[in-house]
Amino acid sequence: MNPTIYLSCLVVFSVFLLGKVHAENEDEFVTEKQRLLSVYGDSSVDEATKYRNVDNLVTFYDKYSTLLPLTPDLSKRAEDLLRRYKEENARAVLVDGAPAQGGFWMPLVKLLIVQLGVEIASEGVKRAIGS
């Protein structure tokens, strides 16, 4: 096969794969964003559900923070809280693979992240209504 044709086919195939991966990531972003908005943006959702989804919120923010239109102040607060959350998770002592009971800081950091999630969700709803 002619090297030029081979290289052209390889480039077209690579662009196709990159486009497909980008579309899948965008679909995943939209799906997860809607799910987290339904958890943190709905006042009828109980606090236990919000606490159970803190890890998902942290993962989502880590992965897609550049796609979220947050104010600089809200973005800085989110970065600070997530840094603290990760530090506390790193310090957590595991007993038989599960975190030990007790501790003061982790529940406090989780509370702050839940409040931040609610604030980000309400900000997103306001922007959606405003546009």
From Swiss-Prot:
Protein localization: Secreted
What this protein is called in its record is Protein Turandot M
Set out the biological process GO terms recorded for this chain's protein: cellular response to heat; defense response to Gram-positive bacterium; innate immune response; response to heat
What does this gene product do? A humoral factor that may play a role in stress tolerance. Requires Mekk1 expression in the fat body to regulate response to septic injury and consequent immune response.
A matching Pfam family? Turandot
Q: Which N-terminal stretch is annotated as signal sequence?
A: 1-23
Broad class of the protein's primary localization: secreted
The question of whether Signal is a record keyword is answered with yes
Matching InterPro entries: Turandot
- Family membership noted in the UniProt record: Belongs to the Turandot family.
GO cellular component entries: extracellular space
- The lineage's top-level taxon is Eukaryota
Keyword line: Immunity, Innate immunity, Secreted, Signal
